[in-house]
Amino acid sequence: MVWNHTTLHMRSKDKNWTYLQMLLPQNNELELINFLRKKWGKKVLWHLEAVSQQGSPRLAALPVLKWNGIDELNEIMEDCKKLGAVIFNPHVLTVEGGGLGVVDADQVKAKLRFDPKGLLNPGKLAGWEIKEQFNI
């Protein structure tokens, strides 16, 4: 199963490819890409997209990675974070674990509004379990 067309095409040739989602550091994109290219070579291939964040142009990335285990994946993510990238890890269960790192009351409020019984994607939003703390 894949989330994007780049990973789909790579996995159609070799099932050992996976991907990450990240926002590259503003004004430091090439340093990160060049560092990873030097350290990881062809184990990390780039799919870049231009996005707007609060009116400023940014580069988002969906790099495809040759899967060599969780330790190597974590090392690649740490390399990216050290150089200022924001990682949205698709290899975890919860929204909070994927990138935010904290419970977002606005997301809990939205889930309460659109899924008041919590039937959709149970366990995906960690904040759902502590929704009473938000007085909503």
Segments the model singles out, each with a brief description of its role:
Residues 1-136:
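Conserved glycine-rich FAD pyrophosphate-binding loop
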